[in-house]
Amino acid sequence: MSTTEFPTTTKRLMGWGRTAPTVASVLSTSDPEVIVRAVTRAAEEGGRGVIARGLGRSYGDNAQNGGGLVIDMPALNRIHSIDSGTRLVDVDAGVSLDQLMKAALPHGLWVPVLPGTRQVTVGGAIGCDIHGKNHHSAGSFGNHVRSMELLTANGEVRHLTPAGPDSDLFWATVGGNGLTGIILRATIEMTPTETAYFIADGDVTGSLDETIAFHSDGSEANYTYSSAWFDAISKPPKLGRAAISRGSLAKLDQLPSKLQKDPLKFDAPQLLTLPDIFPNGLANKFTFMPIGELWYRKSGTYRNKVQNLTQFYHPLDMFGEWNRAYGSAGFLQYQFVVPTEAVEEFKSIIVDIQRSGHYSFLNVFKLFGPGNQAPLSFPIPGWNVCVDFPIKAGLHEFVTELDRRVLEFGGRLYTAKDSRTTAETFHAMYPRIDEWIRIRRSVDPDGVFASDMARRLQLL
């Protein structure tokens, strides 16, 4: 591709887990017409194709394209309109959820679905169909997209809606990891709010059985947001004990008078950026156990506590580049969900993780609600768990066995987190994958949109 017409830089790219790096040509532009011409040129030249990349917070290889072209989207970041009456925002795909939150809050609007970080673009949120603490009440991000402009392989920009004439392409793009085309712009329906704060309740459980029982008693319906940190290191009976945080956006009259003076103030500071100095091996059982014990004891039980966005939702966003704490070898975030009825099988997986010798401190437990229409959307009703394993010998073999178990129990892995499962396993986990591939090939028969993940999982 001509570097005169399309000035690119050669970069080594990897996911947030800092594993499986590859080198690609990267084009960054704020002009959507340049993106259209670059994709058209890539289609004409063949080769390794092109993929869009947002802020690089996917943990695996879905936004990498070794030997090909990567469109760096964050420069395309205009907010075109915010309508507090209809609750609709019209934004470029490179707008981050952090940027959108700051712009929308003065209008009394809240991002409808937030993952564990705000450092995600709108395009990435759609492409991965991200979910958050409110999945049981609001579903995933794609549920709130009212339209999008999708650049397809032939250079056409198509206007897509969830129930329009091209609804199959809309839903194939939701969760499609950028492989149906490049999302240039989207309209999102936001959530109305009176404040930028939460009213939160905290609870602790003493064992895995207690944690599961707590999430099975129906009380989740009383809260908009819910998730838990759980102990994956201690032996039974402490294994699976949890610090559970649940809450809803605060009403104005629920705030103390001091906060009522500026209830929509964006209150989520970043304290520091971690330097890249941490040695491999520092993240281990002996550092994780005391941190976990401190976190569990500090959490405690509380009611009706007013918390800001950082306290309730995004503690890790206080630390820029926090993934550096795992050292240059990186880490694997393993996220899976199994159906609600597979509860005994789910418990056996947690026991096996504890016994494996691969230890994780940053563990998330969430009971998902219903999924949506997207063939490759990750959430299904069931037990969802995220664990962060430092990279070390034997990990690949262990998680390969976990893959087998998750599949056997009717579960699946999340493309935004995966960088190593096989095509055979992935295809078996997603029963509608043939439907998705048919739709993708109908708009991109030559595989112009391609990524390291797409080649690994045979999605082209």
UniProtKB/Swiss-Prot annotation:
Component of the DprE1-DprE2 complex that catalyzes the 2-step epimerization of decaprenyl-phospho-ribose (DPR) to decaprenyl-phospho-arabinose (DPA), a key precursor that serves as the arabinose donor required for the synthesis of cell-wall arabinans. DprE1 catalyzes the first step of epimerization, namely FAD-dependent oxidation of the C2' hydroxyl of DPR to yield the keto intermediate decaprenyl-phospho-2'-keto-D-arabinose (DPX). Monomer. Interacts with DprE2 to form an epimerase complex. InterPro entries: ALO_C, FAD-bd_PCMH, FAD-bd_PCMH-like_sf, FAD-bd_PCMH_sub1, FAD-bd_PCMH_sub2, FAD_lactone_oxidase-like, Oxid_FAD_bind_N, Vanillyl_alc_oxidase_C-sub2. It is an enzyme of class 1 (oxidoreductase). It is found in: Periplasm. Residues 19-193 form the FAD-binding PCMH-type domain. One of its GO terms (biological process) is response to antibiotic. GO terms for molecular function: D-arabinono-1,4-lactone oxidase activity; FAD binding; L-gulono-1,4-lactone dehydrogenase activity. Changing residue 417 to A: Loss of catalytic activity. It catalyses: trans,octa-cis-decaprenylphospho-beta-D-ribofuranose + FAD + H(+) = trans,octa-cis-decaprenylphospho-beta-D-erythro-pentofuranosid-2-ulose + FADH2. This is Decaprenylphosphoryl-beta-D-ribose oxidase. Its EC number is 1.1.98.3. It comes from Mycolicibacterium smegmatis (strain ATCC 700084 / mc(2)155) (Mycobacterium smegmatis). Disruption phenotype: Disruption of this gene is only possible in the presence of a plasmid-encoded copy of the gene. Curing of this 'rescue' plasmid from the bacterial population results in a cessation of growth, demonstrating gene essentiality. The keyword DNA-binding does not apply. Belongs to the DprE1 family. Is inhibited by 8-nitro-benzothiazinones (BTZs) such as BTZ043; BTZs are a new class of antimycobacterial agents that block formation of both cell-wall lipoarabinomannan and arabinogalactan via inhibition of decaprenyl-phospho-arabinose (DPA) synthesis. BTZs are suicide inhibitors that act via covalent modification of DprE1; the essential nitro group of these compounds is reduced by DprE1 to a nitroso group, which then specifically reacts with Cys-386 of DprE1 to form an irreversible semimercaptal adduct. Pfam families: ALO, FAD_binding_4. It comes from the Bacteria. FAD binds at residues 52-62, 116, 121-124, 128-131, 183, 414. One of its GO terms (cellular component) is periplasmic space. The lineage of its organism: Bacteria, Bacillati, Actinomycetota, Actinomycetes, Mycobacteriales.
